[in-house]
């Protein structure tokens, strides 16, 4: 399939449903027009153990983002600053190249606004023998229809559940409907791919089906994080794997310090985002998860917030080798 054959003339790929004609060059709320743009394609070692293993996850970072959180850890790609335009054919080659490098899976990071492109490239790669599981790595801000359209393409969902509070979702992501939209999407994901399944691949335990729900704890938001954990547990129990993350990095404050005018304004509006999450708050959240009876979840060592979790978006693996 050629990019010109993909219909995004009234774009409704994400819950923003902005309706612009991306195919004609207009940019959606996500920032993207109709051209496929990728910032990095390489082995990535900082996902959850059954996603990265010791060999690495074959991770493709798509430029732009439908959610555009003010504290985004990958702002340079969410804002479209990093990336190069490639064809669907080239993306299919990237999938195959990552398999040849020993990747455990193909990990598509923030692909929502390029979902038709990503699926078309998977069709081409599979015709050439690419057989790895596909991880759909998403902010959670997906429509139920979009999840259904991924049937046969997404094997594992690595999805965020960022907020239980509509107020926080509005404050940080301009998406007050996020809590319900993400919960509906999560229900559809569980329905589509089922309970977690694993195999062994080159000595690593690899997740081949199922859903991992990530929650990144934010500074000053302990009570909302508790509501997130409780909501996920009460709705899905052990049907999903929960990952409680402590790697928030105050990149907004760093940008403001460097003189970025937009970052300065946003930091003035949200001054709490200038600090890291105290280890004591993170420990309280883990204790709360334990008190609910959640026995098997991913957590991070204290002081996990480091820029080492943020890759260099230097076009590695994107252009033809």
Where are these regions (language model features)?
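Alpha-helix N-cap and loop-to-helix initiation/capping positions
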Residues: 86, 113, 173-181, 220, ...
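Alpha-helix-loop-beta-strand connector modules within alpha/beta enzyme cores
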Residues: 121-135, 184-192, 279-285
């Amino acid at each position: 399939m050629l990019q010109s054959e993909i219909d995004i003339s009234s774009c409704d790929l994400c819950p923003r449903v902005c309706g612009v004609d991306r195919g004609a060059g207009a940019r959606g709320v996500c920032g993207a027009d109709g051209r496929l743009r990728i910032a990095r394609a390489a082995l990535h070692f900082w996902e959850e153990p059954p996603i990265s293993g010791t060999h690495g996850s074959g991770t493709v970072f798509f430029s732009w983002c439908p959610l555009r959180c003010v504290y985004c850890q990958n702002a340079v790609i969410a804002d479209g600053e990093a990336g190069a335009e490639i064809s669907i054919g080239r993306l299919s080659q990237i999938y195959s190249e990552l398999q040849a490098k020993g990747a455990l899976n193909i990990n598509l990071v923030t692909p929502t606004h390029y979902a038709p492109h990503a699926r078309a490239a998977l069709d081409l790669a599979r015709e050439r023998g690419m057989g790895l599981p596909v991880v759909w790595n998403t902010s959670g801000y997906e429509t139920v229809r979009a999840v259904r359209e991924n049937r046969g393409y997404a094997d594992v969902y690595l999805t965020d559940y960022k907020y239980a509070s509509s107020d926080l979702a509005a404050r940080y992501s301009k998406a007050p409907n996020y809590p319900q939209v993400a919960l509906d999407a999560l229900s559809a994901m569980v329905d589509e791919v089922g309970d977690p399944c694993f195999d062994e691949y080159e000595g690593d335990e690899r997740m081949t089906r199922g859903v991992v729900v990530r929650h990144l704890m934010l500074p000053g938001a302990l009570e909302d994080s508790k509501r997130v954990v409780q909501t996920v547990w009460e709705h899905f129990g052990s049907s999903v794997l929960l990952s409680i993350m402590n790697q928030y990095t105050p990149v907004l404050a760093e940008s403001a310090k460097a003189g970025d005018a937009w970052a300065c304004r946003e930091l003035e509006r949200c001054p709490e985002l200038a600090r890291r999450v105290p280890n004591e708050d993170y420990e309280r959240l883990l204790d709360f998860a334990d008190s609910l009876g959640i026995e098997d979840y991913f957590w991070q060592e204290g002081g996990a917030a480091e820029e080492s979790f943020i890759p260099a978006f230097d076009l590695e693996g994107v252009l033809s080798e």
